[in-house]
C-alpha cells in the first residue's frame, strides 16, 4: 500500500459514508401525488425513498415538487475534499517559530447544495520536554457553496517557542479539519494523525491555548 506523504508526516484521510437517516416525511411530485417515506440516498439525480413497509422507491429528483427539491438541497450534505497547508519561518528571532495554517474545502459532488456548513481547523503542538499537547490555533467559520465550489479557512499567525532553546518550547505535530452540516452532523474530517481522528469530538471542544494530555484531558504544565 502506498502512503501519501506531506512534509514528513503521513496523511490519513478517513472517508465517512453518510447515513442520512432523515425521518419519514410527506413527499409530493409536480402532479400533486403524495407519498410518506424516509429519504435513503441520492445518486445521479435519483432519489431513493423507503416506505414504512420496507419497499424502496427510486424517483427522479426533477419530478418532485419545487419545495421538495429545495429541501433536498439543504438536507443532503455535499461531498467535499479538504486540502491543508502551512507556512512557517523564524523571522529575526531564532528562538521563535512563526506559523500560519489554512484549509481549502472543495465541493466535489455535482448536486446543488444551498445549506450552511461549518468548518473548524485546529492546529496542535507538543511540549517536547513535557508530556502535554497544546492547541496552537483554532478557527471556525460558517459558509455555503452558493457562489463558489471552494471555501478557504485561514488561521491566524501564531508563534511557538522553539523546544531546542526552552524547557517550555513547543513544536507543531499536526492538525485536524472538521466539516459539519447545519445540524452538527459530520460531513468530512481530515488529519495527519490517527489519534486525532479517533478522538475529534474531544479535541474540538478545546479552545486555543488549551493544554491536554495523551488521553485528551485538560491539564497544566
Short names for language-model regions:
Residues 20-136, 141, 159-174, 200-206:
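Compositionally biased alpha-helical segments
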Residues 108-115, 144-148, 182-185:
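A short, structured loop/turn motif at beta-sheet edges
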Residues 7-19:
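Bacterial N-terminal signal peptides
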Residues 159-221:
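Acidic, serine/threonine- and proline-rich intrinsically disordered appendage/tail regions
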Residues 78-82, 143-146, 217-220:
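Noncatalytic linker/hinge segments flanking ATPase motor cores
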Amino acid at each position: 500500500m502506498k502512503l501519501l506523504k506531506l512534509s514528513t508526516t503521513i496523511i490519513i484521510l478517513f472517508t465517512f459514508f453518510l447515513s442520512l437517516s432523515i425521518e419519514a416525511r410527506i413527499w409530493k411530485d409536480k402532479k400533486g401525488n403524495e407519498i410518506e417515506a424516509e429519504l435513503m440516498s441520492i445518486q445521479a439525480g435519483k432519489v431513493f425513498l423507503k416506505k414504512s413497509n420496507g419497499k424502496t422507491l427510486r424517483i427522479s429528483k426533477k419530478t418532485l415538487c419545487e419545495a421538495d427539491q429545495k429541501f433536498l438541497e439543504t438536507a443532503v450534505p455535499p461531498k467535499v475534499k479538504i486540502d491543508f497547508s502551512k507556512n512557517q519561518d523564524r523571522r529575526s528571532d531564532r528562538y521563535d517559530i512563526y506559523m500560519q495554517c489554512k484549509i481549502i474545502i472543495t465541493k466535489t459532488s455535482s448536486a446543488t447544495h444551498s445549506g450552511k456548513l461549518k468548518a473548524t481547523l485546529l492546529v496542535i503542538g507538543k511540549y517536547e520536554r513535557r508530556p502535554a499537547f497544546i492547541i496552537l490555533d483554532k478557527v471556525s467559520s460558517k459558509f455555503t457553496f452558493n457562489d463558489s465550489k471552494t471555501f478557504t479557512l485561514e488561521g491566524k499567525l501564531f508563534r511557538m517557542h522553539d523546544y531546542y532553546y526552552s524547557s517550555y518550547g513547543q513544536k507543531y505535530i499536526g492538525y485536524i479539519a472538521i466539516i459539519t452540516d447545519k445540524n452538527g452532523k459530520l460531513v468530512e474530517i481530515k488529519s495527519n494523525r490517527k489519534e486525532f481522528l479517533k478522538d475529534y469530538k474531544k479535541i474540538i471542544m478545546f479552545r486555543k491555548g488549551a493544554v491536554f494530555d495523551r488521553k485528551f484531558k485538560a491539564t497544566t504544565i
